[in-house]
């Protein structure tokens, strides 16, 4: 049996209203604290209710509007090095990843690019500031992962991570009320990203009985939440649990070919990562339905027996139908082009990650052409 390591937060608060724990956490151990957030949260009602108590506890605020670049992280480090001893992140996956990267690199001497996977030349240490992660979306699971994703679409054309076990946030606060009011597209894009994490981790060659059980639990939460994301408090609670479990399982078991492709497209095009994954998921399910790989067939049979035993169609085609029929936003219908040159670059750089099959370039091309319009 494959051995896995699961690393989680020291503290994880969960439930409606749990953001009320933030002020007591900060006042219990006063330290110079920097907030990373996004305009949608800072302009919202929850922040308004916290601002009078929170603002005096902060040195300042950095606003994140997209996936952070190495240059932006270096600028934050230069501005705050030696002044900050704790970080709070309130926002979506891009905000949390930016804060995780800053918390680590403010404790390292070299520029961000030197430590990044794929292109860096220096091993990153585990030095990092304590981080309180509070997601306002449910997709990346960044509040419990060991990596921070950094995207440079301008200079190095790379999307890669900083990674160390110590980069799991010290504390996570999972408050489903923070998802309320999110646009349907954001809810759907993030939720399908959470599903993709869970599904790829379930099918990973490095998964084991424990990680697969967590994946199945997360997928069950996703199936419950998906049709009702914009109309049910219970659905928001379920998708937040799915996202968290997706973060745990991807960290323990790894991801597959969908993310092996999505990361390379993300380095070339500023498309929402969750939408990219969702669009690649559908042709991947078609490919998977035709697979004769014994372990894939056994795992899909178990998934179907556990989660939708009354269905008699192939589990892959059931999932395609369920996802597309019940989506609150049609993530697969927008016109998202990539050029022929970008297709060639993506095929050259992408890989199957921890998939049970090493997918060939023609198979990966089939997925990409099924997900995007080639210009």
List where the protein language model places each region.
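ATP/NTP phosphate-donor binding region
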Residues: 1-86, 330
């Amino acid at each position: 049996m494959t051995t896995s390591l699961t690393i989680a937060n020291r503290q994880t608060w969960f439930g409606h209203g749990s953001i009320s724990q933030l002020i007591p956490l900060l006042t219990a151990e006063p330290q110079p604290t920097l907030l990373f957030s996004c305009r949608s949260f800072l302009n919202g009602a929850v922040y308004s209710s916290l601002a009078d108590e929170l603002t005096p506890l902060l040195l300042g605020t950095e606003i994140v509007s997209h996936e952070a670049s190495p240059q932006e992280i270096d600028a934050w480090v230069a501005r705050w090095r030696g002044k900050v001893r704790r970080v709070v992140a309130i926002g979506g996956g891009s905000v949390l990843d930016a804060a995780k990267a800053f918390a680590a690199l403010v404790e390292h001497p070299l520029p961000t690019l030197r430590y990044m996977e794929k292109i860096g030349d220096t091993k990153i240490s585990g030095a990092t500031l304590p981080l309180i992660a509070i997601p306002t979306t449910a997709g990346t699971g960044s509040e419990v992962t060991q990596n921070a994703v950094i995207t440079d679409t301008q200079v190095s054309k790379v999307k890669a991570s900083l990674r160390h076990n110590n980069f799991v946030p010290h504390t996570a606060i999972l408050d489903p009320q923070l998802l309320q009011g999110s646009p349907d597209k954001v809810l759907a894009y993030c939720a399908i990203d959470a599903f993709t994490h869970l599904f790829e981790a379930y099918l990973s060659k490095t998964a084991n009985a424990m990680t697969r059980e967590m994946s199945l639990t997360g997928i069950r939460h996703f199936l419950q939440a998906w049709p009702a994301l914009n109309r049910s408090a219970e659905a928001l609670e379920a998708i937040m649990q799915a996202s968290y479990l997706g973060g745990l399982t991807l960290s323990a078991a790894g991801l597959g070919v969908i993310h092996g492709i999505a990361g390379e497209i993300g380095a070339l095009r500023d498309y929402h990562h969750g939408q990219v994954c969702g669009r690649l998921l559908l042709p991947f399910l078609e490919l998977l339905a035709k697979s004769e790989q014994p372990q894939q067939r056994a795992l899909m049979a178990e998934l179907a027996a556990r989660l939708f035993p009354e269905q008699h169609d192939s589990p892959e085609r059931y999932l395609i139908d369920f996802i597309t029929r019940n989506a609150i936003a049609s993530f697969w219908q927008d016109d998202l082009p990539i050029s022929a040159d970008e297709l060639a670059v993506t095929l050259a750089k992408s890989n199957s990650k921890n998939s049970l099959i090493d997918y060939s370039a023609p198979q990966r091309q089939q997925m990409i052409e099924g997900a995007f319009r080639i210009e």
